[in-house]
Amino acid sequence: MTELIRIAALFAVTAVAEIVGCYLPWLVLKGGRPVWLLVPAALSLALFAWLLTLHPSAAGRTYAAYGGVYIGVALLWLRVVDGVALTRWDAAGAALALGGMAMIALQPRA
């Protein structure tokens, strides 16, 4: 269980770095925010790429498992940053995605 918590926490930090790296350009392009926001966006995406190298599995498995956590963090972002109420469908989808992540991340190793 400790390994799952460690992996999930690393995935969550990775997801935040990716979301920030994509959200800031969105603010520039859609929200008319200053262009200098592209600098921290690029740094955040570089951090995201580096964080992916810290995950314990092969790249493909890491990306597959990461997707589940990304969905949960993106929904949290939707609620906290965008102020949109989550639906029971959001919660059910996140639960399914996180269950899939756990299966991939915690499978027995040969």
UniProtKB/Swiss-Prot annotation:
Signal peptide (from-to): none
> What residue ranges are annotated as transmembrane?
9-29, 34-54, 66-86
Q: Which UniProt keywords apply?
A: Cell inner membrane, Cell membrane, Membrane, Transmembrane, Transmembrane helix
Transmembrane helix in keyword set: yes
Among InterPro entries, the record links this protein to: UPF0060
Topologically, how does it sit relative to the membrane?
Multi-pass membrane protein
Q: Where in the cell is it found?
A: Cell inner membrane
* CC terms in the record's Gene Ontology section: plasma membrane
* Superkingdom of origin organism: Bacteria
Task: Give the UniProt family note.
Answer: Belongs to the UPF0060 family.
Kindly give the PANTHER family that the UniProt entry links to this protein: UPF0060 MEMBRANE PROTEIN YNFA
Which protein is depicted? UPF0060 membrane protein Bcep1808_1236
